[in-house]
């Protein structure tokens, strides 16, 4: 371990949404998101949420001018399923489409297949040295179901 690196401890089954670094709220676009999921064989279900609004409105909660994303995972020996949905009225400047990069940590083998809303994903990256699986989904304001089948 290098002295200039700080270890990060994450709870098994945690969802960690992240955006690119930004200096001010005015430069936040919201059209790109990284969603990290920390898989673990001891976890068969997990949930996470993310709140998003325009960063300006003082009464966004009272007027439901926000999106509240819900992330749910369920796993067994053969599959990992991740569901993404949102509620709230949204806000005027919210993007119509978000590019979400899903990064699954502690993934030890290349998957047999990945289905996004029953469509086989043609592109994904499995990083053997880091034990991560990553791929992109487009969020178009409707629920997304992801099903990853493991090799046996």
Regions found by a protein language model. Give the residues of each.
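Catalytic core of carbohydrate-active enzymes
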Residues: 1-111, 117-118, 141
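Generic structural detector for well-ordered beta-strands
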Residues: 83, 103, 134-136, 147
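Generic alpha-helical hydrophobic packing signal
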Residues: 116-117, 146
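Extracellular/luminal ectodomains and secreted, surface-exposed scaffolds of diverse proteins
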Residues: 117-141
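Surface-exposed interaction regions enriched in Ser/Thr/Asp/Glu
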Residues: 136-152
């Amino acid at each position: 371990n290098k002295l200039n690196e700080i270890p990060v401890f994450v709870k098994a089954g945690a969802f960690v949404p992240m955006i690119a670094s930004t200096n001010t709220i005015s430069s936040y676009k919201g059209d790109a998101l990284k969603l990290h999921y920390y898989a673990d064989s001891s976890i068969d279900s997990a949930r996470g949420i993310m709140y998003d609004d325009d960063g300006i409105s003082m009464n966004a909660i009272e007027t439901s001018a926000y999106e509240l994303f819900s992330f749910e995972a369920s796993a067994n020996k053969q599959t990992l399923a991740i569901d993404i949905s949102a509620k709230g009225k949204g806000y005027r400047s919210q993007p119509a489409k978000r590019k979400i990069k899903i990064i699954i940590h502690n993934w030890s083998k290349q998957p047999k297949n990945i289905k996004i809303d029953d469509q086989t994903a043609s592109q994904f990256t499995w990083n053997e040295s880091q034990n991560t699986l990553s791929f992109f989904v487009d969020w178009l304001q409707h629920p997304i179901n992801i099903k990853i089948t493991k090799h046996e």
